[in-house]
């Protein structure tokens, strides 16, 4: 039997930002028994001894007091290091470009946090993500948030039926300007707080400086595929496929882009032109596949896919290789498909699941220098 809202405990992850603040407010207004939890995933004391997590937690405390809900802080630093940060370093070490947000959602926010919330008697967890959950045809479906510009299903692509059955996304039907307005009307302390961007554990720090604390940089040669040396790179891990900034190649003509990496010889391949054919792939092998539905997939099916966040939907054919691997055939060649990033599958507004980009091909030829 379904519980009434006041009998339903919802434990919401609160970051100290406006989105999770309004999500908590909405749940409270809807009559749920709401508890706010601040997750401390990273020791982020900066060089001045200021811990931004402390500032964020103070914002959570203020908002929870304004709304009238209890709050706690939970430390997931060890789990985050083991499951997210170690993966992040391993991928960069392998010359790939990882997506820690996908792993954080899978392992921390909807696993470690979910388990903690259930121990607190939660019926559901909630977050400030822009996504929707619907129960249709006997199973849970994850749908894009109505705000196209903010939809975050790309980062949630690994969530399972079990996780979705315990999840609420209060912001899924709203657009960002509405959320800012609600926060303002309610007088929430975070109403005017700037949105956080970038990788959470790097924050405002310089990416190169941060990464070099954990992985020794190995400078090497920057050259074209035909062998023309164009300069030196600071370390392959600092560059991603399709990158333009930071190459330092002067001269006239079209701008230069990173088009590939040779890990064995520590070479960064570069070439000119945004639409350079070296940047385009039409076939992808992806691994670590996760489907939202438990129903068996057809061996081959058509859908759309995003190969990076906020990319337009691309028409593709997905072929199931095995339970962990798919082959993706693109209707049109796609620019800068990057090993290590997530590819996420959609049927209209429904997010079907996702995988990690492993190998990229063009016209049947493997792009060995990608990755």
UniProtKB/Swiss-Prot annotation:
Region described as Interaction with tRNA: 150-152, 308-309
RNA-binding as UniProt keyword: yes
Catalytic activity: S-sulfanyl-L-cysteinyl-[protein] + uridine(34) in tRNA + AH2 + ATP = 2-thiouridine(34) in tRNA + L-cysteinyl-[protein] + A + AMP + diphosphate + H(+)
Protein name: tRNA-specific 2-thiouridylase MnmA
Keyword annotations: ATP-binding, Cytoplasm, Disulfide bond, Nucleotide-binding, RNA-binding, Transferase, tRNA processing, tRNA-binding
Region (Interaction with target base in tRNA): 99-101
InterPro entries: MnmA-like (IPR004506), MnmA-like_C (IPR046885), MnmA-like_central (IPR046884), MnmA-like_central_sf (IPR023382), Rossmann-like_a/b/a_fold (IPR014729)
Gene: mnmA
Site (Interaction with tRNA): 129, 341
Listed EC numbers: 2.8.1.13
Molecular-function GO term, any one: ATP binding
Catalytic site positions: 104, 200
UniProt: ATP binding residues: 13-20, 39, 128
Subcellular location: Cytoplasm
Listed GO biological process terms: tRNA wobble position uridine thiolation
Transferase in keyword set: yes
Disulfide bonds: 104-200
Pfam families, sorted: tRNA_Me_trans (PF03054), tRNA_Me_trans_C (PF20258), tRNA_Me_trans_M (PF20259)
Family: Belongs to the MnmA/TRMU family.
Top-rank lineage group of the source organism: Bacteria
């Amino acid at each position: 039997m379904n519980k009434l809202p006041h009998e339903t405990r919802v434990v919401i992850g609160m970051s100290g930002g406006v989105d999770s603040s309004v999500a908590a407010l909405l749940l409270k207004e809807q009559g749920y028994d709401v508890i706010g939890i601040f997750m401390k995933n990273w020791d982020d004391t900066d060089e001045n001894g200021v811990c931004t997590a402390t500032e964020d937690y103070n914002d959570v405390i203020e908002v929870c007091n304004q709304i009238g809900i209890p709050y706690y802080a939970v430390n997931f630093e060890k789990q985050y290091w083991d499951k997210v940060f170690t993966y992040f370093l391993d991928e960069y070490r392998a010359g790939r470009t990882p997506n820690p947000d996908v792993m954080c959602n899978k392992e921390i926010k909807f696993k470690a946090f979910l388990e903690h919330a259930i121990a607190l008697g939660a019926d559901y967890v909630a977050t400030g993500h822009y996504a929707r959950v619907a129960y249709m045809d006997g199973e849970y479906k994850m749908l894009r948030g109505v705000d196209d510009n903010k939809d975050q299903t790309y980062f949630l692509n690994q969530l399972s039926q079990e996780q979705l059955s315990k999840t609420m996304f209060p912001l899924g039907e709203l657009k960002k300007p509405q959320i800012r307005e609600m926060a303002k009307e309610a007088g929430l302390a975070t109403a005017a707080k700037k949105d956080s961007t970038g990788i959470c554990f790097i924050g405002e720090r310089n990416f190169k400086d941060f990464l070099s604390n954990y992985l020794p940089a190995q400078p090497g040669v920057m050259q074209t595929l035909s062998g023309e040396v164009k300069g030196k790179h600071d370390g392959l891990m600092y560059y991603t496929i399709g990158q333009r900034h930071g190459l330092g190649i002067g001269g006239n003509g079209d701008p230069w882009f990173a088009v590939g990496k040779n890990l064995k010889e520590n070479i960064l391949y570069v070439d000119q032109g945004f639409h350079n054919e070296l940047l385009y792939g039409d076939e992808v092998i992806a691994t670590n596949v996760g489907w939202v539905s438990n129903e068996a997939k057809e061996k081959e099916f058509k859908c759309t896919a995003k190969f990076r966040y906020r990319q337009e939907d691309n028409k593709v054919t997905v072929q199931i290789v095995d339970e962990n691997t798919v082959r993706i055939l693109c209707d049109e060649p796609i620019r800068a498909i990057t090993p290590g990033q997530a590819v996420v599958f959609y049927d209209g507004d429904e997010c079907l699941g996702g995988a990690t980009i492993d190998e990229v091909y063009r016209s049947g030829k493997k792009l060995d220098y990608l990755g």
